[in-house]
Amino acid sequence: MKQAVIVDCIRTPMGRSKAGVFRNVRAETLSAELMKGLLLRNPQLDPNAIEDVIWGCVQQTLEQGFNIARNASLLAGIPKTAGAVTVNRLCGSSMEAIHQAARAIMTGMGDTFIIGGVEHMGHVPMNHGVDFHPGLANNVAKASGMMGLTAEMLGKLHGISREQQDAFAVRSHQRAHAATVEGRFAKEIYAIEGHDANGALIKVLHDEVIRPETSMESLAALRPVFDPANGTVTAGTSSALSDGASAMLVMEESKARALGLPIRARIRSMAVAGCDAAIMGYGPVPATQKALARAGITVNDLDVIELNEAFAAQSLPCVKDLGLLDVVDEKINLNGGAIALGHPLGCSGARISTTLINLMEHKDATLGLATMCIGLGQGIATVFERV
């Protein structure tokens, strides 16, 4: 079977969704800039060789509608001979894009793919136009479509305290801030234009949503937002609302080597799994277990892990049940996570994978895992290997 490898991976800075640096920049532009960036960074690649552009996006309406993958690829000047498709596995959409490209390569259905994802949550809110079928109530808990309440449920089932959640959130901001100051995001962030608070055009170089001043004291002052009477989940322990895009160049290994392109990581295994929609945040556990089994390894073999931080109350049960509580500070979300950086839905899968690959290089690690929960009860996971 042919091998799928990551040749390059980049992301935009994460912009604040409310009056942030990308308030005047459309989702198609965020996407197109990254597509162009991949080609500029890898001049050995003939753009005419691109088989398909596979782009994750959840709210496929307004500027994100009508196949944003194609709109963005045309804006980017990618040859019209390349295909383009937008995929939606909710929060796992751009990781699904990785999987689709990898499967195509493994089965001989192309050797060069641009994949990624985008979500401009400032322009297209996550609940825009949502209209669940009334019949879902027959076998799905009514609150399953409210992600914050599913996090409350998961936290209660696993005995996760308010203090544990607050500490996890503080860690996320502290580590993301340290990664920024120390330049550890520099290799993955592809600077693009945005606007400052006064409306002046600027080159955006850093994430806008990290709050380095976050402390246990400041978080303790926040009220529960989803279950005000009995809850523990606050805005401070939930993923930030942000706008952003991420992208990867995925190729068949021998083709990349023949062109003299770098092999940054090989896709070792992939998996998706379902779980009860009422505890959708638990999805990374069964998905990771599948991916590890397919790779023929155990969780102890992993050197670095990126677990998407939808909520602290959701992340901690996954860490606990995967047997990783004792190695959080050595292996998990070492540059912070979505609580600090935000979770632009369609962007996040390729974003955490990009951060993971850069961390693996920084630490000279061999095996890494990227995994995330998915609304309505799914998980998705990818094992990467440096070669």
From Swiss-Prot:
CDD domains: thiolase (cd00751). Gene3D superfamilies: 3.40.47.10. GO terms for biological process: fatty acid beta-oxidation; phenylacetate catabolic process. It is found in: Cytoplasm. This is 3-ketoacyl-CoA thiolase. Signal peptide: none annotated. Pfam families: Thiolase_C, Thiolase_N. NCBIfam families: AcCoA-C-Actrans, fadA, PRK08947.1.
